[in-house]
């Protein structure tokens, strides 16, 4: 009984496509990351605010390199993003005029399936729903889903689903299972149909309906062609609803490729071609099977077929035989080139529409592999395996080539008339950006005229841009032409003019078009990166270590209390994109200063203008009234204090570059009382201090200018201010009698005046919370009011009954929006939403509307803070309003997924020195710029930032350390765009959010340290706090010159040699993350594993020491046996380099053992005597380290093929061995005598990539993952009658992870703040969690559950699966079951004893948080959560405790417990408690 939860989203980009999906956003980019679909748009920003190098975790060296590339292109680029469509005529003269294109996330959807392809499908011209295009998705096991954008729901909507995995379609009985064949999705460029190639040679055709071409052609001329015929409306009724099912597609059908042509027995690749009237497909195939093709040459065939969708028939129009056998891809080329480009490992061949071929050989090996006629460009020495090709400039015949090592090349076609006469390749020089791509590319998608998205599975995906350099003559000519240009034209006009210049009139010849294009767009290309998507894929290996700083340094002293106990370190990426990813759950702030400030209860930093002398004040007001201070440093800090006796005061401090100092001699009165809020108004001419009993206004020198008392003139009451919100020129106060006070500052007198509350609702309603918001994005704009007015300030109020009111200031006559259902927390909030009677309400304590984002893009969000500090986020969106439609009918709020639960308040002793502090309400703080983020901070016992970047959704990240009771932004010369806060321990810190880490992309802190060579493994050495990284660099393979049997090898002189790996060990300092030592292995020696082992180093004293063990393989060809080697290194102290104290460590070789047969593939500790378990070839051997530097074998176990992992349950001698082809072996090791015994085995037909233990109290489970993405739960139980006395392992269940198959794992202890009933562990056995890592970048946990918790959560998951709509029409339950095609051929891993127990899917449980309170209550009751009772002691994440520690939240002395009704409240707390354990990083808080 376990629960599988994915902690991070996949980051490896597998597919991408550009389309017009969302109306009004131009071109969108759809990105597939295995099971995550993301939709982006682009935004052009000035290079002055280009922050991808600072907000996306690039290190110092990479930022310097990026700066170098950036500077080099400034001399050639005027406007960056669109220079090429201006013909390259604009040559940059100033750096501040350069622009960059940025990606902005529009939507993301997690799919219960693995995407294998994306395709753009254009909608018919008459379609009115959504955008101009639909998106077609293909999935494993031959499934298609057609989706479109739903404007009203602001999300993707499924149009149709298509399944083709029927048994009769798979083929012959001897054909391999369906999942072993890759699926290929291709679409016709004119969107007439799409094709899905699945199984061995099946082709599913999905036709799309097309309008009558003669009727719907844009060039219909009524004078020549007569009146346009009327469309047949017989299928429609009066209200517009059709009686005929209106679908954009026709019934699909499946064709066997052999029916197209009998010789299509072994298809390789296919693509739809351009410029054909009917759908036309080009198929590359082989006449021989791959196994029978060795020794044969030129047996590939390229054929072109025209498809008749009505008759379901085809016609062969072209066939080219005798093609090289290393071709692997067909690339369809648009006009004017046309035809198809066949890509091979050693050549490129173009086939035009008439069958004429032109090709080039790109390396010397081509002559030996083919007799096909090719132009020789062998001096390029290119390897085209894994390359990517896309259009760069079609009118110039230029295509971009990206090799598998990331190098850029330019393919140019020579066009004579209407035919292609040849092609050539030119590599881009590194100084022109030819090496900006670091990894192999999986997808290319053209975004604009000079930008292209480059997706990768092995590193960061980037948005690549290019410009063209020109000579002085062309520059001079460009300037002359610029004088005649109309500079008022917009981009679309210029683009249209460009097209007119390129193609001219309809009668213009291709030669004229080409010459015009060359005249406009000549010059060398320069490439640079505009933006990037963070990736931690693939995760090769994981370890954990302690954060470390220089001993006795100021940083070490300052970081005390705000550093995590451990950090997760992963070896990620491949090739030049390899890196170490350092991950922490919470933000680790960069401490600028630290001091004790126990009385601080609130911070507010302000920057105000100096008052102007009266002699300089004109008739129209002060001369500096329009001066913007937003970029100025903060000058003053107001601090609210509470001393030990509970006396409340406020002080003001002057901020300096060195810190801050107390300010005296002003009219600021500390004894006036406790400050509730502070800020500036009157365009920063007045400093506002909101006290509990009054509001004070000061000028820029803190001279008192006005006092506004809180006095009700009618009743004489003096209500006290509870919360306040400032949005110049308005002030909103929420008082303890639930009334509101609204004031406006006059622009001339700069004095506050109360705004008359004309609406009776404002005076008769009790208000719980509220805020002011300045709308800068236009989401809340009133179309009837012009921009630039003060009407963009809105007031949001929440009544005690849970109703949301929105007023547009200064109009207080009536609200512009009323939503009565806010307290029900619905998935979508509108003015018309209504809940059923008796539905439970949430206790909402605070609302805040704030902009979230970064310097690239920010957007408003409505943030609800619940009584237990949980947060709910809503994103507002508008529908296009019709004439006369009220504002409330066009505004909607969409709930944003957030599975982060607040921490429990710390338990305090009853005789606490300050009983008032537990009762004090700490409102959320809006921060406009903290390290470039527009963010919101949540103070209290669960201090958190809500962070968002342009490329991510909002994420709630906690701040490392204890609770926070005061916080403010802090922008000074010594701490730019930082913040100051005081924790509950009385420590105040001036800090910054580190800019070398990423946060919002994965929901945790990620810092990438580039390694530059392929990283295989990483290990942490605790005594020295250093990391050893096992890498493999590539080098040319040299034949042994001293071989006595092959003396001709010494005379080898070939230049194009194969590349092989050579192992390198790198020692990294945990302080500076720099390489301080390097050890190279022998040629052809590859590092396979690196582990830190506690070994016995002395046979006489039995001394133990932490040493680094390395396993390698020597592979010198298939005709020589593979040998292995075991190294044991110590990390010794040496004299450091001057100025580099971290270089005081070096790797020292202690032992080295050659293994004559087989590679050393895995290492582990074993037993209690300091021995090591070595997986060497087909044996697993226990070895001990001798003092003479040898490794003595003491016990062994024979294995079958190839051992992928060995694990020992620490200190028990229980070992687990996984074979790549023969399953899992469970063994035991004894030390007296030395012996290894086989306890049990799994099935011998299971391909195991990784295996590990998962203890659960007195039960011990074995977790094995195979190549198909299945996680198998096995158990050793000799008492079970079917286990043959334990010789066969019991199979408990199998769970499908899709593309996220675990390849690495860590068994970690689970540490909960309070005991949990979810883990079935006795007191003497601590709970454990298995952390899993996959090649897609997904980190996941597998944790055991107790019986009663498993039953409830499993029932809840079933209800969510059956009761919620699922994206793309997929089935989450079927997704987690073993693949149908895989299970048909898969033997059970062990004796079936699962008795129907499946692993609970945490991804489904996360969707429980999407529901409103009514649906939550209903589902929780059905799942067995008892209404009205306690939470059965479930409180692992502190759930079930209200803020303030007293069972409820106190605001101004009022207890808010049960304010909104608590039907089912305890029930929700019980569900929340159990979800808080199984979702997220619960139990792993030490990271």
Swiss-Prot record:
Residues 486-504 have a biased composition (Acidic residues). GO terms for molecular function: RNA binding. GO terms for biological process: mRNA processing. Residues 486-513 are annotated as: Disordered. It is found in: Nucleus. Its main location: nucleus. Transmembrane segments: none annotated. GO terms for cellular component: mRNA cleavage and polyadenylation specificity factor complex; nucleus. Keywords: mRNA processing, Nucleus, RNA-binding. RNA-binding component of the cleavage and polyadenylation factor (CPF) complex, which plays a key role in polyadenylation-dependent pre-mRNA 3'-end formation and cooperates with cleavage factors including the CFIA complex and hrp1/CFIB. Involved in poly(A) site recognition. May be involved in coupling transcription termination and mRNA 3'-end formation. Belongs to the CFT1 family. This is Protein cft1. It comes from Neurospora crassa (strain ATCC 24698 / 74-OR23-1A / CBS 708.71 / DSM 1257 / FGSC 987).
């Amino acid at each position: 009984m376990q629960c599988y939860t994915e902690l991070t989203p996949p980051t490896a980009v597998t597919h991408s496509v550009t389309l017009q999906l969302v109306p009004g956003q131009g071109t969108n980019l759809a990105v597939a990351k295995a099971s995550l679909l993301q939709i982006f748009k682009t935004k052009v920003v000035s290079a002055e605010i280009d922050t991808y190098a600072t907000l996306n975790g690039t290190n110092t060296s990479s930022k310097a390199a990026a700066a170098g590339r950036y500077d080099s292109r400034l001399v050639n680029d005027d406007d960056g993003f669109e220079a090429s469509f201006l013909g390259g005529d604009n040559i940059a003269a100033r750096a501040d005029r350069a622009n960059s294109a940025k990606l902005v996330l529009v939507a993301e959807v997690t799919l219960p399936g693995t995407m294998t392809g994306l395709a753009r499908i254009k909608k018919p011209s008459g379609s009115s729903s959504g955008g101009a295009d639909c998106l077609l998705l293909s999935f494993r096991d031959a499934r298609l889903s057609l989706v479109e954008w739903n404007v009203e729901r602001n999300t993707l909507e499924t149009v149709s689903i298509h399944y083709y995995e029927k048994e009769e379609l798979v083929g012959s009985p001897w054909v391999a299972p369906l999942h072993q064949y890759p699926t290929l999705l291709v679409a016709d460029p004119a969107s007439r149909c799409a094709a899905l190639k699945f199984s061995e040679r099946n082709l599913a055709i999905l036709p799309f309906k097309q309008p009558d071409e003669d009727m719907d052609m844009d060039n219909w001329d009524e004078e020549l062609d007569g009146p346009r015929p009327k469309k047949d409306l017989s299928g429609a009724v009066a209200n517009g609803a059709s009686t005929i099912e209106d679908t954009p597609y026709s019934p699909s059908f499946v064709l066997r490729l052999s029916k197209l042509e009998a010789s299509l027995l072994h298809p390789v690749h296919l693509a739809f071609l351009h410029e054909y009237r009917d759908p036309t497909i080009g198929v590359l195939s082989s006449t021989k099977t791959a196994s029978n093709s060795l020794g044969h040459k030129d047996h590939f065939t390229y054929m072109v077929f025209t498809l008749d969708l009505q008759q379901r028939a085809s016609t062969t129009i072209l066939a080219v035989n005798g093609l090289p056998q290393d071709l692997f891809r067909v690339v369809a080329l648009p006009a004017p080139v046309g035809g198809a480009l066949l890509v091979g490992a050693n050549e490129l061949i173009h086939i035009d529409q008439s069958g004429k071929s032109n090709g080039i050989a790109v390396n010397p090996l081509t002559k030996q592999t083919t007799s096909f006629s090719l132009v020789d460009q062998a001096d390029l020495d290119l390897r085209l395996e894994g390359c990517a090709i896309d259009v760069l400039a079609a009118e110039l015949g230029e295509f971009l080539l990206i090799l598998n090592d990331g190098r850029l090349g330019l393919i140019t076609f020579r066009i004579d008339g209407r035919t292609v006469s040849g092609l050539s390749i030119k590599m881009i020089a590194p100084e022109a950006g030819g090496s900006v791509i670091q990894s192999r590319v999986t997808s290319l998608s053209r975004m604009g005229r000079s930008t292209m998205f480059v997706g990768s599975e092995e590193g960061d995906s980037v948005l690549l841009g290019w410009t063209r350099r020109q000579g002085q003559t062309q520059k001079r000519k460009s300037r002359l032409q610029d004088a005649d240009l109309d500079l008022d034209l917009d981009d679309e006009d210029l683009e249209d003019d460009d097209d007119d210049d390129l193609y001219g009139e309809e009668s213009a010849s291709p030669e004229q078009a080409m010459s015009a294009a060359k005249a406009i767009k000549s010059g060398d290309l320069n490439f640079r990166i505009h933006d990037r998507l963070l990736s931690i894929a693939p995760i090769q290996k994981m370890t954990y270590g302690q954060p470390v700083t220089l001993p006795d340094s100021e940083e070490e002293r300052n970081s005390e209390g705000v550093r995590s106990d451990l950090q997760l370190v992963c070896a990620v990426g491949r090739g030049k994109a390899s890196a170490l990813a350092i991950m922490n759950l919470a933000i680790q702030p960069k401490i600028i200063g630290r001091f004790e400030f126990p009385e601080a209860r609130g911070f507010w930093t302000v920057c105000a203008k100096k008052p102007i002398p009266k002699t300089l004040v004109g008739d129209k007001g002060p001369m500096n009234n329009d001066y913007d201070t937003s970029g100025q440093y903060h000058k003053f800090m107001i601090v609210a204090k509470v001393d030990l006796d509970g006396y409340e005061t406020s002080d003001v401090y002057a901020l300096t570059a060195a810190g801050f100092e107390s300010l005296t001699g002003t009219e600021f009165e500390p004894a006036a009382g406790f400050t509730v809020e502070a800020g500036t108004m009157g365009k920063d001419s007045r400093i506002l201090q909101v006290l509990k009993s009054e509001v004070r206004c000061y000028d820029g020198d803190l001279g008192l200018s006005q006092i506004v008392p809180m006095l009700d003139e009618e009743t004489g009451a003096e209500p006290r201010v509870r919360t306040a919100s400032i949005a110049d020129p308005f002030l909103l106060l929420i008082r303890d009698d639930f009334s509101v006070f609204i004031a406006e500052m006059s622009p001339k007198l700069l004095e506050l005046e109360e705004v008359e509350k004309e609406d009776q609702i404002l005076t008769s309603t009790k208000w719980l919370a509220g805020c002011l918001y300045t709308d800068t994005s236009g989401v809340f704009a009133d179309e009837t009011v012009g921009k630039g007015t003060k009407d963009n300030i809105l007031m949001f109020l929440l009544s005690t009954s849970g109703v949301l009111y929105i007023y547009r200031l200064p109009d207080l006559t009536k609200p512009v929006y009323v939503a009565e259902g806010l307290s029900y927390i619905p998935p979508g909030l509108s003015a018309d939403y209504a809940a059923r009677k008796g539905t439970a309400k949430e206790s909402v304590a605070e609302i805040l509307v704030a902009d979230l984002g970064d310097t690239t893009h920010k957007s408003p969000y409505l943030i609800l803070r619940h009584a237990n500090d949980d947060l709910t986020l809503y994103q507002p969106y508008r529908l296009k309003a019709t004439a006369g439609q009220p504002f409330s009918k066009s505004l909607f709020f969409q709930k944003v997924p957030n599975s982060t639960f607040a921490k429990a308040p710390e338990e305090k002793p009853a005789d606490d020195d300050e009983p008032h502090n537990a009762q004090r309400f700490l409102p959320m703080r809006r921060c406009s710029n903290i390290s470039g983020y527009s963010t919101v901070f949540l103070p209290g016992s669960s201090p958190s930032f809500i962070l968002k970047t342009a490329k991510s959704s909002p994420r709630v990240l906690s701040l490392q350390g204890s609770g926070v009771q005061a916080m403010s932004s802090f922008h000074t010369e010594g701490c730019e765009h930082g913040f100051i806060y005081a924790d509950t321990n009385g420590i105040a810190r001036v800090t910054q959010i580190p800019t070398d880490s990423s946060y919002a992309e994965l929901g945790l802190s990620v810092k990438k340290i580039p390694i530059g060579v392929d990283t295989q493994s990483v290990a942490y050495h605790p005594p020295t706090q250093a990391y050893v990284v096992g890498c493999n660099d590539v080098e040319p393979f040299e034949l042994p010159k001293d071989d006595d049997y092959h003396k001709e090898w010494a005379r080898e002189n070939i230049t194009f040699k194969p590349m092989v790996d050579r192992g390198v060990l790198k020692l990294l300092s945990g302080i500076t993350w720099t390489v301080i030592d390097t050890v190279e292995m022998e040629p052809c020696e590859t590092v396979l594993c690196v582990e830190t082992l506690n070994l016995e180093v002395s046979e006489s004293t039995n001394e133990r020491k932490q040493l680094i063990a390395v396993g390698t393989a020597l592979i010198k060809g298939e005709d020589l046996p593979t040998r292995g080697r075991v190294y044991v290194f110590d990390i010794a102290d040496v004299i450091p380099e001057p100025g580099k104290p971290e270089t005081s460590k070096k790797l020292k070789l202690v032992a080295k053992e050659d293994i004559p047969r087989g590679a050393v593939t895995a290492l582990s500790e074993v037993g209690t005597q300091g021995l090591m378990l070595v997986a060497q070839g087909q044996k697993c051997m226990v070895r001990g380290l001798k003092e003479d530097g040898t490794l003595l074998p003491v016990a062994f176990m024979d294995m079958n093929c190839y051992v992928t992992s060995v694990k020992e349950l620490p200190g028990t001698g229980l070992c687990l061995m996984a074979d790549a082809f023969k399953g899992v072996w469970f063994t035991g090791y004894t030390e007296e005598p030395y012996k290894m015994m086989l306890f049990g085995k799994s099935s011998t037909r299971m391909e195991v990539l990784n295996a590990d233990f998962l203890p659960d109290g007195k039960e011990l489970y074995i977790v094995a993952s195979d190549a198909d993405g299945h996680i198998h739960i096995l158990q050793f139980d000799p008492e079970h009658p079917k286990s043959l006395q334990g010789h066969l392992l019991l199979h408990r269940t199998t769970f499908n992870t899709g593309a996220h198959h675990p390849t690495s794992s860590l068994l970690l202890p689970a540490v909960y703040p309070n005991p949990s009933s979810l883990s079935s562990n006795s007191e003497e056995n601590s709970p454990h969690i298995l952390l899993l890592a996959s090649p897609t970048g997904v980190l996941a946990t597998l944790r055991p559950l107790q019986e009663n918790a498993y039953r409830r959560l499993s029932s809840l998951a079933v209800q969510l699966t059956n009761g919620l709509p699922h994206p793309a029409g997929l089935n989450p339950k079927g997704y987690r079951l073993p693949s149908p095609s895989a299970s048909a051929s898969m033997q059970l891993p062990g004796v079936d004893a699962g008795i129907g127990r499946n692993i609970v899917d945490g991804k489904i449980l996360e969707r429980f948080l999407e529901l409103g309170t009514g649906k939550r209550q209903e589902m929780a009751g059905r799942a067995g959560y008892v209404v009205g009772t306690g939470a059965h002691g479930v409180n692992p994440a502190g759930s079930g405790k209200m803020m303030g520690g007293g069972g409820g939240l106190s605001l101004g002395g009022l207890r808010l417990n049960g304010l909104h009704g608590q039907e089912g409240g305890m029930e929700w707390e019980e569900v929340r408690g159990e979800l808080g354990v199984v979702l997220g990083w619960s139990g792993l808080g030490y990271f």
